[in-house]
């Protein structure tokens, strides 16, 4: 009996796993990480109520969302040991939520790149629609191959890059999200602790490297290395092509990857 109950609990965890993504999206959209940061790194419920754009009638729900996010590891929940009421609970940032602070005047902004826009991109309904189409896509054997090449294309009518090119608003969000992640990765790769990874390399091609943020950071950290970026033609424009330290190559990685000592493929 205990084994069956445990099995059911595991199924519940899988079935409602999407709530973690939705709670994270909610926290970013409401600006909870910034609100806690502006309160000095720790905030009470009344302070969050005052700082967040939440309707007064919905404020009782904030504590539930914060508890869920604390259990998920996004925030840290500090409950007073003297048994005070819920209003005495305080919330603070964790290493994960510090990456979601986008205040330009914050100390953290000089230490890392904010990943809020990238996380919102990952939590986009576009991806959830695609995941819900997975079974239909696997069963489909009669559809147009071009239209149903991936579950994402079946659900949204175009590839992710196709949507970014067709919808200027989404394209801007996509570019900002990918750029923020590239800036974060670039900061890590440029540190001396990563030097052994690049030892002996004289050339590197960043496949799908976007605006070249990562490649430029590597080129600055390792000036002896010839760095290039392979991107789709619609991404590579005259402005990107003239950045000096990095060469931009227009092409499709599914068809051709320029020769180099190393290939960087960020996922």
Task: Give the positions of each predicted feature.
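Conserved Class I S-adenosyl-L-methionine-dependent methyltransferase catalytic core
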Residues: 2, 7-203
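Short, low-complexity, polar/charged sequence segments that are solvent-exposed and flexible
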Residues: 43, 247-250, 267
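A short, aliphatic-rich alpha-helical micro-motif
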Residues: 198, 257-260
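Class I SAM-dependent methyltransferase SAM/SAH-binding core
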Residues: 201-256
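A conserved beta-strand element that flanks and buttresses the S-adenosyl-L-methionine
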Residues: 263-265
């Amino acid at each position: 009996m205990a084994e069956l109950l445990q099995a059911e609990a595991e199924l519940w965890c899988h079935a409602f796993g999407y709530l973690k993504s939705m709670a994270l999206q909610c926290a970013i959209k409401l600006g909870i990480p910034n609100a806690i940061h502006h309160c000095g790194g720790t905030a009470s419920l009344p302070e969050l109520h005052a700082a967040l754009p939440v309707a007064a009638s919905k404020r009782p729900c904030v504590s539930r969302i914060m508890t869920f996010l604390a259990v998920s590891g996004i925030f840290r929940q500090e409950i007073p040991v003297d048994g005070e009421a819920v209003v005495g609970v305080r919330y603070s940032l964790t290493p994960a939520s510090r990456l979601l602070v986008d205040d330009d005047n914050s100390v953290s902004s000089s230490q890392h790149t904010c990943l809020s826009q990238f996380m919102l991109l990952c939590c986009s309904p576009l991806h959830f629609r695609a995941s819900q189409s997975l079974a239909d896509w696997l069963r489909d054997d009669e559809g147009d191959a071009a239209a149903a090449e991936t579950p994402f294309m079946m659900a949204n009518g175009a590839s992710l890059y196709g949507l970014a090119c067709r919808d200027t608003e989404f394209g801007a969000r996509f570019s900002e999200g990918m750029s923020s992640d590239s800036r974060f990765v670039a900061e890590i790769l440029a540190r001396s602790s990563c030097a052994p990874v690049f030892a002996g390399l004289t050339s590197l091609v960043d496949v799908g490297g976007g605006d070249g943020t990562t490649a430029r950071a590597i080129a600055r950290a390792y000036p002896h290395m010839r760095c290039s970026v392979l991107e789709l033609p619609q991404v590579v424009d005259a402005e990107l092509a003239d950045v000096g330290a990095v060469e931009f190559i227009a092409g499709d990685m599914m068809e051709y990857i320029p020769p180099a000592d190393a290939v960087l493929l960020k996922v």
